[in-house]
From Swiss-Prot:
Biotechnology comment: Secalonic acids show unprecedented anticancer activities against various human cancer cells and might be interesting for further derivatization, targeting diseases such as cancer.
Swiss-Prot/TrEMBL keywords: Multifunctional enzyme, Phosphopantetheine, Phosphoprotein, Transferase
Protein name as catalogued: Atrochrysone carboxylic acid synthase AacuL
GO terms for MF: fatty acid synthase activity; phosphopantetheine binding
Cross-referenced Gene3D superfamilies: 3.30.70.3290, 3.40.47.10, ACP-like, Malonyl-Coenzyme A Acyl Carrier Protein, domain 2, Polyketide synthase dehydratase
Entry EC no(s): 2.3.1.-
The protein's annotated pathway: Secondary metabolite biosynthesis
Region spans: N-terminal acylcarrier protein transacylase domain (SAT): 28-272
Organism: Aspergillus aculeatus (strain ATCC 16872 / CBS 172.66 / WB 5094)
GO biological process: fatty acid biosynthetic process; secondary metabolite biosynthetic process
A Pfam short name: CurL-like_PKS_C
Amino acid sequence: MVTYTPPAEAQDLPTKLKVLYFSNEFPTDDLSTLLRRLHSHSKHSSHPILARFLSEATRVLRNEVSQLRMELGQLVPAFESVTTLAGETKLRKGPLAQSIDGVLLCVLQLGMYIGYASHPLWFFLHCELYPEDQATETNSVLTGLGVGILVSTAVSVSTSLDDAVTAGVEVLRIAFRLGVFVANVSHNLEDVDAEASDSWAYVVHGMTVDEAQKELDDIQAKERTPSASKIFVSAISETSVTVSGPPSRLKALFRNYASFRDRKFAHLPVYGGLCHAAHIYAREDAQAVVRAPSLPARYKPVVPVMSTSSGQPFLASSAAELFEQVIFEVLTKQIVWDNVIRGVAERVAKTDVHDVNIKVFRHSLPAQQLSTALTSAMTDLPVDADDLLAWVGTDVDHGQYSPGSSMQSKIAIVGMSCRMPGGATDTEKFWDLLEAGLDVHRRIPADRFDVDSHHDPTGKRMNTSHTAYGCFIDEPGLFDAPFFNMSPREAEQTDPMQRLAIVTAYEALERAGYVANRTPATNLNRIGTWYGQASDDYREVNTGQEISTYFIPGGCRAFGPGRINYFFKFAGPSFNCDTACSSSLATIQAACTALWAGDVDTVVAGGLNVLTNSDAFAGLCNGHFLTKTPNACKTWDCTADGYCRADGVGSIVMKRLDDALADNDNILGVIPAAATNHSANAVSITHPHAGHQSDLYRQVMARAGIDPLDVSYVEFHGTGTQAGDAEEMESITNVFAPIKGKRRTSKQPLHIGAVKANVGHGEAAAGVTALIKVLLMLQKGAIPPHVGIKTSINPGFPKDMERRNLHIPFETTAWSRTSEKKRIAVVNNFSAAGGNTTLVLEEGPVRDRLGSDPRPSHVFTVSAKSKISLKGNLQRLIAYLEKNEDVSMADLAYSLTARRYHHNHRVAATATDTSSLKQQLISKLDGVDSMKPMPTTGAPPVAFVFTGQGAADKSMNLQLYHHSPFFRSQLESLDRLGQQHGFPSFLPAVDGSYPKDHAWPPVITQVAHTSVEIALARYWETLGIKPEVVAGHSLGEYAAFVIAGVLSASDAIFLVGSRAQMLESLCTAGTHKMMAVKASRCEIEDAIKDLPYDLACVNGPKETVLSGTTEQMEAVSVPLKEKGYRVIFLDVPFAFHSAQTDPILDLFEETARKSVIFRPPTLPIVSPLLGRVVFDEKSLNAEYLRRATRGTVDFLSAMQNAQETSIVDKDTVWVEVGPHPVCVAFIKASFDPAPVTVGSFRRGEDNWTTLAAGLGQLHTAGLPVRWGEFHRPFEASLRLLDLPTYSWNEKNYWIQYRGDWALTKGNTFYDAEKGINRQAAAAPVSSLSTTTVQQIIEENFSGSSGKVVMQSDLMQPDLLAAAHGHKMNNCGVVTSSIHGDIVYTLGEYLYKKLIPMAKTVHANITDLKVTKGLVAQSNTKVPQYFRVTATTADIHAGAADFVWENVANDGTVSEPFATCRVVYGDADHWLSSWSPLAHLVQGRIETLERLAAEGIANRFSHKMAYTLFGNNLVEYADKYRGMQAVVMHEFEAFADVTLKHVSGGGSYTVPPYFIDSVAHLAGFIMNVSDASDTANTFCVTPGWDSMRFARPLVPGQRYRSYVKMIPTDDDPSVYLGDVYVFQDKVIMGMVGGIQFRRYPRILMNRFFAAPDSSIAKSYAAAGGAGPAVSAPAPAPPVSPPKPAVVEAALQANPSASTPASTPAPAAVTAAPAVNSDSTSGKALVLIANEAGLEQSDLTDDAAFANLGVDSLMSLVIAEKFREELGIVVAGSLFLEYPTIGALRSWLEEYYS
């Protein structure tokens, strides 16, 4: 016992030694509670340093996680604070357990230390650790164990608590990397289930280190344990030792040997891998973990850190050196805690210490041992201890929270998309109209409301708009409903704002290169949506007319962003905000605030406005908001009198700038600050206030840290109102262009602009519209011209703009990026409700490419959700390549693969240059229709097959080793294992150091082969390609066993190397050979009779390998060659699977039995030795390896057994893992059809080229390739390209506002007007009246524009007779020729009204589209009205548009059913243009004449022609029967026509029967030709491209018509042709591009039934009878309630309503038996027959869309249901019940 006596001179100066002990274990308290309380304290005003530490720790950990390969990174859930990870139990038991626990221990101990040292009572702690004079030795020491000693280094190098934050997060980074590194190395020693809690260390009590070491040496020598797998002593104390090693070997040690089993022992909670292992790790490993720390040079060790091995302080001169020494000790040195105790005691003895204070994080055994030892060694020395965790238990004063600044990070905008007025369907078109200085206002389009009835410039009519103008998106109803999993019904009822929001969100994300969960910032849990919207027009007006299923989810605002979150699976918040005109920018500011606060990491934000409600126009007019003149906003004009309303939809994607840079995003612009305030002191709520606006600018500029004079552009709110413009100009000039005080220099010009002058005021979308404009300005380097000043500038604006250096750009002005200063802009957006929002925007940083991409070949992918879109995407990419021939192929591949969503219709191409790529894409475009989409059942299974020896060059140059850090680290780790086992390094054999024919000893060749395959398999797994079954060929089995978990990588390398050494020492190279024979086993036996040989391998039906002595093989080869079999001698030194290996078998088996551990396989293994699939652990052992060395490799039988047991099938994708694809040929030969096979490497080909081709195949097969991992090594050198966006398969989903109820609304104002209108209806507007144009009910003419509306009653006798003269299905049908006469009549009337001097009008009827037949009703006593509207904006443009609508008897107008355009022309010009064609057509007519004479073509008389026509489709009245004779061959014919004299029968401009007579030859061909299936189909025309006659059609005159109908490429059921009409061998008329579509004859009743008949009504009740000329498009399923017709059927048949007693089964893979007597059974048989399916195809999970049941087939089957089963259903039945199972269940429920 040493008695401690303080030195006499020290009595007056008591000195205390402070010892801080950092444990390697968590305290026994609940860790989550401790960290939660630590986090809570960090919010207190007294702990700003703690708050910064936790914030920085979170940031650093996120950064480290982002560097992990994807399969590991995705294990870490999204986290707002590192402290929350303590509760992630699954994470802390998984592969990253040691890394995460190391981080949490760092956070806990450093956080508690910082918090303790910051506390008012103990603030001096940290200062006391350090001497005031750095030359003086400190009276403090730092100790610790494991990660704890690493934590202590942060304290050692920090002279302040602020320094401790910086050093602490660096230590946290190292701790995380240490855990990952140790886990990776340990994984090669033993692949342990991370959740199995198998320990890598046991403590043994009562055993000395010498005893333990002797026992271990003896045991492991006897077992021949490979050196890398040996158990070793890792820690020593006086009473115990700790032994460490692979868990399975530790278990065996304590199970099998009494010297350990019989002592007291316990396993330690060490689950992450091995440390303190000098035989495993080296100095360079420590350097790899530490790398280059980012600490400044001033960080140096000040407080000594005691080595846990030597007990002496580490001697380091810098922080980096200290970190490296500590990590090296943790990895390689034994823990000898007694040495630490001794070292501290020595320090006490050497210094003038009066007492010792030990600081601990809760009391622990090592700290207690230290205290006890000091007390025992030195009597009378006071030793006390403080708990640094005690303070965290104190209550937090919630009144003194100080959350700190949330405005530290700038916000990057990384993607944008828009739909703007003026046809701006993308940002490029938007820029084009801005740059061109366009004002895109126009009259309110008809799809919104009838502007004429809802507009009154006098303002006298109630509820009308004073203006008829606005700025509008073209066809806002266009939408790709199936893409977004919406049915047509849901799409139609969903607000177009919501639809365009999700479309532009997708496009913005696509342009941002967004891929879900690719990086921490794109974690789905951390993404939210924010959209501004200020109206609900579509819900209030359009869908409100007939409220249905989707009225609420389709119309309520919250569902817009909610739908985006739901579709993309974003789990962050979704907000819809309304602040009136500032909605979008205020919402974007709110989204920025969420980013600044850390609530989310990625944001999709924007604004929405689509105008359909006339009320808003009326209300704004009455509130004096809107301009009365036809223009967009007259911003800054002296006559500005209000704004012009506008549509607008814009979406942007935002991230924090550091996240965007880390994600390698394109940064379109950066937001340093944004803010909102309110004009509280304005004279009225809607009036702006310059003072408050100026305050806002100063606030936001201060927040951004930017001088207002450095702003070079301001985007005004600029609505074009006198008050608003003047106030905003005043506020802007006061702050950004002042005349007093500091002013702008000549080099600081300020330009201003306002986008509303171009596209109007988008209201809720105005802010995002302005923001996108400025983003485009930054992108294009230009400021577009301002077009708002129509007359002269607002006189209230400053007269000294020049002195202020303030400029309005009246032409495009350069605004280029310079190196001198940033371009900075301000965007304003104000609210009519008083809010002001301002956002500062600056250009993004310039980023340099780091490194280069050496890959010579790249893979390019294109995908879509439909074939139409796939074609469009391919076409867009081809067009892009044509415009950008010098595009970087590496960038293009990266952008198309790693930065895009991948859908189920896929193509992939591998190319080295744009020309080659373009040709491949063109080729693939041609084959899209024949491509099969990915299966809906998910990705196909993957099998890895590992190549045997002999496939590679003797020396390899693996490009993957040089350029893939992961692959290289794997190979180097495996190479080190080999060296630890005593084998030479194999790296020179694979790194290209030697020529490819340089031979190596077998031990190097075979270890290299196995190691390359293990590393390659793991590389495939990082790319997302994971096997479900493995197979190995010969030597390849060892790598297969590693991947299947049977052997550790260490054991496999040991076995392969040992076997090779045995071959070298016990066998003679070159005495035996192996010979491949292109013949079957039986053929070989027949050919060589009794000659001796060994059957080495049976690889395929015709692939066999023999082995034997050299003499035997040469002898055997002779008869085989004589038989014509191909023979190849393999270049291998030893003949495996032959008698040559006999000398090594016993020794090898014994070595395998004693030295390695076999574990149960985690994957099925296809065993070529056993010829079957192995699942159990008993089959794979040392004896198996012996037999595999000598026995036959029966690869063929193994493959056949795998197929028979369904382990693999035709869908299995095979990846050959090896140096050259050999086995895939055997696999293809074993399967019919051949499966998809992919090689990894190929001799003579760059690795990247082979991998690119293989990944393309795997991608198109449907596997989820992790493209980000593939590009990761080169990402710093790659850039995201701004490629064309998705090509939508759009249809117009729109509910038209009908009538004028928005005006009347129950008021009495319009009662009198209605009476006047009724009187006016009785008195026609015009005297014009013909049979087809019976009454002009409205006409308006203004200058050169005009509108004429006619209404006719189909029941009028002459018109009804004309319809009945064209009977189909016994119904009178208005033929296209009647439509033609209407157009000729109205077209001439309109033209002459506007150009009264015109004498002759020649009209070309173009683009006629009839979407639904107009069929005469059967009740002739009730009117059947239809209406045609003709309009022209400018008659001098030579065109007018026509629209047909049905009109109900109550005046309700239905949706248009036909449209066309008239183009006025010159008859003489037409004649001259046709003249060159006449002889060509005449030549065809002469050919038909000759064919008729030869009996090849058919000749029909007048009567025969019309009899056949009537029998097959159309029964024509006599006056229509103008064809006198017809000659026809297949789809080509001519007819001689004489137009009939008809007396009476009505008045016409061009009689319909004249038009029909010369044109219906096309219909005759399609419905009579023997080339058509007229028995089962009929053909009708939906219209034509052009119809014109240069001369009048005259009764009694003779004409000749000719036409040839040709099927279209896109749809073989649609035919096109040009009808030429001759008079005297001159072409005088033509019907160009007349179209006929073929339909099943069964649909005749559905298409052509009198609208008041019972059958038509039943179709209407079932969902509509479908259009006459087109059918609904397929769409995704919905689950609506039972159809109304079914309800009626059930009421009529009560027994049918009884539900089936057994519910329909769940989806199964096999088709259930069909009960053909049941209704459901009959229905399925009917479906199978109609669709040409087998009963086996009708599995419950089979989707009708995948079975080829398209919209047309749906109509046919629905008709069959009605006819054969008596079930009336809609054609949409298969959308509502999209699978066989769903339909079966429905039928059984309602019809069983």
